[in-house]
Amino acid sequence: MIVGKVLDMDEKTAIIMTDDFAFLNVVRTSEMAVGKKVKVLDSDIIKPKNSLRRYLPVAAVAACFVIVLSFVLMFINGNTARKNIYAYVGIDINPSIELWINYNNKIAEAKALNGDAETVLEGLELKEKTVAEAVNEIVQKSMELGFISREKENIILISTACDLKAGEGSENKDVQNKIGQLFDDVNKAVSDLKNSGITTRILNLTLEERESSKEENISMGRYAVYLKAKEQNVNLTIDEIKDADLLELIAKVGIDNENVPEDIVTEDKDNLDAINTGPAESAVPEVTETLPATSTPGRTEGNTATGSVDSTPALSKNETPGKTETPGRTFNTPAKSSLGQSSTPKPVSPVQTATATKGIGTLTPRNSPTPVIPSTGIQWIDQANERINEIRKRNVQIKVVDSSNKPIENAYVEAVLTNHAFGFGTAITRRAMYDSNYTKFIKDHFNWAVFENESKWYTNEPSMGIITYDDADYLYEFCRSNGIKVRGHCIFWEAEEWQPAWVRSLDPFTLRFAVDNRLNSAVGHFKGKFEHWDVNNEMIHGNFFKSRLGESIWPYMFNRAREIDPNAKYFVNNNITTLKEADDCVALVNWLRSQGVRVDGVGVHGHFGDSVDRNLLKGILDKLSVLNLPIWITEYDSVTPDEYRRADNLENLYRTAFSHPSVEGIVMWGFWERVHWRGRDASIVNDNWTLNEAGRRFESLMNEWTTRAYGSTDGSGSFGFRGFYGTYRITVTVPGKGKYNYTLNLNRGSGTLQTTYRIP
């Protein structure tokens, strides 16, 4: 949907000016009038008239008049409406919403601060409702949309800002009383949330601090956390706080009741343990951070590729809980699945064991004060594994207690990683979705995806004004329904040969018009859906737009995309297989930054021939890491008829990238022989759905980089393990009471993550 003001009309068409001062020729509708603000669809845009260029000077004058008129009306209407606003209540889940409160302590307006919030607020009528009523409706809608799940830990940050002088000169003299009533209402909302098993935190801000949050384009609540972090000398930037997981953020900063008025209590201090909803249901555990002990944390886990345990038998007192299994390095073909290929969980379901430890603290090996990581006998792999253990894992300490907070000994605990924090992805294509083997392989092996061609300009708009997203929408819905995150590739492509044919023939004036339309259409269509966008593919190798529209078009593409969808992350994306190309990419990002562009990440293509030089790759990653940005291998493949060499190439890239601290994801550019753009010699899955050697190597790595820990609690009710970052399913079996299921989010952080599960 595009919003703009009508500047001129004839019998069939109208010219509108959008909020970013783009001029569009659109189909006229009956409700249009010159000067009126209207909404039009992408499909309403028609090819620009020849007269549009001549019209621009007149349009500019009209635009100035419309802008001045708009400011006058906005000033009059805005002042009238806002005189009755005296307080603001912020709600941060991941959707961030701000409620404007009038003197009646009712909602005057609900503002969406991000795309997720727009989705939540759609269809909700919150005006004239109390804060408690509004919070309840927002939470219910967030549950329906999956932003809040009873199967995982949830926390809601509520922030307030009140105008203590708002009542001066008005009929409402008792502002302090109004504020007291407002906090009573907030308390009721908090109480309702607590009864639902949702943890809350409340923070107060001044109006000046609220204004500062608006200037920084961050919610009140997250800005309050930023101020708290500064106060406690916690090194977090505003950008990091904008994007951080709330649960991890609050634990790291240590948000408690210090900023909360005395009459607002967010949690029962005598009941900070997990809220259990009963056997076989999810509960919300208490999560706290501890600093590492002075001794070296133990690494008591071992990896195996033999599968997972299907049952949770109770252990006798004579058995050793959490026995460690340490297999050797093998690449034998795993058991065959019904598809004929090896059956492996999503890069998300490993096999690991851990030893239960005494007390709560960092994990310590039973028999050794030094870290133990099994050696493969291959030096570069051992070195990579040391780095992986350091940067991709964290210690966890689970404590199981009864309703009286007494530790439960010999409770059987199983922790299984169900979704890896690291991105393991693939390019997918609509033309293969007919095959159930294809879709099953995606669901079983990947947590990220990118569309091979379906979100590129030449696919979305093959002829000027003929726009379609049908194939992309189909792929997105498949990913969404299977919990797979999506990278957007790409808004533009700087190489001339990859432009739509009609774009190559445009003069600069019309091309500039087309660039705006593409931004509005593509980014607007996928707003709130794509996690990442590659803004302009291959900027260090092409100059189609730059040569025709000037170098300023590059910053404009990034900045305008962010205006349309401020919640996506915007990447540069280039083929980088040499150190020179890495230097060129660093120079490009630094130039964009000098032009006021915020670049969120660096995408690296890796389309290799018959070899992958791991030392060269590490050198490239080291050069790019000086930018202090997340790095993604966005397109990987290697073409060679020797499938064993192809397997070695795959491991060289995956293990080198996974062991580099700046890399956050790896996306292979297809996997199945039949639809791979480079054919059989680049695939990991044969046409008949058997794995070739490269596929077996891939599955072996995925098994190696997953975690399954199991064992029994000790006398203090404790069980510990070290696992990869990600989401875990925790199952606690208590003899005589049954089985209890929980969800644990193991995020990056210092020290041991401690959590307590209370068994009723």
From Swiss-Prot:
- UniProt xrefs under SMART domains: Glyco_10
Identify the GO cellular component terms for this protein: plasma membrane
Q: Name one GO biological process term.
A: xylan catabolic process
Tell me the membrane topology, using the record's own terms. Answer: Single-pass membrane protein
Which top EC class applies here? Answer: hydrolase
Q: Name one GO molecular function term.
A: endo-1,4-beta-xylanase activity
Domain RsgI N-terminal anti-sigma stretches: 2-49
Keywords carried by this UniProt record: Carbohydrate metabolism, Cell membrane, Glycosidase, Hydrolase, Membrane, Polysaccharide degradation, Transmembrane, Transmembrane helix, Xylan degradation
Instruction: Give the subcellular location.
Output: Cell membrane
Reactions catalysed, as given in the entry: Endohydrolysis of (1->4)-beta-D-xylosidic linkages in xylans
Q: In which pathway does it act?
A: Glycan degradation; xylan degradation
Q: Which residues form the active site?
A: E538, E635
Q: What is this protein called?
A: Anti-sigma-I factor RsgI6
